[in-house]
């Protein structure tokens, strides 16, 4: 109906005039939570983190999870869900500000890829290996993680930020 709040894959905008085909994919947003809460919980980054970690990663209490791009929208949600599930969380991000913020969010260990050797730090922090890797980056960070991955570990490939510039072939 006119004035309904709907969600769908239509891009970020305040208004949308749907085609007949669009109407099939739009969903009315239920009026059960405040709009900011709904956007946070059910936005694409939240859905990606939730189902990627819980359905593919299947985290168990005590497992070690490494999250690259940990200060990004999806990565930060993954870190927090993993903590709720009782995991030891190692977050990888770039810069003091992002790394400090991750510590405030409860991430157990943080690696600043801009100012440290990721492979060396991972070896120190993941003494019993890595059970889950939520990969938002790819490239050299993925390679560092693979050397420490445990048997029966789960790797969730979510993004490949390291290849976004197009300067190198993946």
Indicate residue ranges for each PLM-predicted region:
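Mid-domain Rossmann-like dinucleotide-binding core that forms the NAD(H)/NADP(H) cofactor-binding site
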Residues: 42-116
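N-terminal Rossmann-like NAD(P) cofactor-binding module of classical short-chain dehydrogenase/reductase
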Residues: 7, 66, 111, 131-134
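Short amphipathic alpha-helix with an adjacent loop that forms part of the alpha/beta core around
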Residues: 117-128
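NAD(P)H dinucleotide-binding glycine-rich loop of Rossmann-like/cofactor-binding domains
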Residues: 2-69
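Glycine-rich phosphate-binding loop and adjacent beta-alpha segment
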Residues: 140-170
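Short glycine-centered segments of the SAM/dcSAM-binding site in methyltransferase folds
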Residues: 5, 64, 88, 153-155, ...
């Amino acid at each position: 109906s006119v004035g309904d709040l709907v969600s769908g894959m239509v891009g970020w905008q305040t208004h949308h005039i749907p085609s007949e085909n669009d109407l099939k994919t739009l969903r009315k947003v239920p009026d059960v939570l405040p709009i900011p809460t709904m956007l946070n919980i059910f936005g694409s980054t939240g859905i990606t983190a939730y189902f990627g970690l819980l359905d593919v990663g299947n985290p168990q209490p005590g497992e070690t999870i490494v999250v690259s791009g940990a200060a990004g929208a999806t990565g930060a949600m993954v870190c927090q869900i993993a903590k709720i599930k009782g995991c030891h969380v190692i977050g990888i991000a770039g810069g003091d500000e992002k790394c400090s913020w991750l510590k405030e969010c409860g991430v157990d260990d943080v690696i600043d890829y801009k100012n440290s050797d990721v492979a060396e730090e991972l070896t120190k922090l993941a003494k019993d290996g890595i059970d889950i890797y939520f990969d938002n980056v790819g490239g050299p960070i993925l390679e560092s993680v693979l050397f420490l991955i445990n048997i029966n570990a789960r790797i969730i490939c979510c993004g490949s930020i390291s290849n976004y510039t197009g300067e190198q072939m993946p």
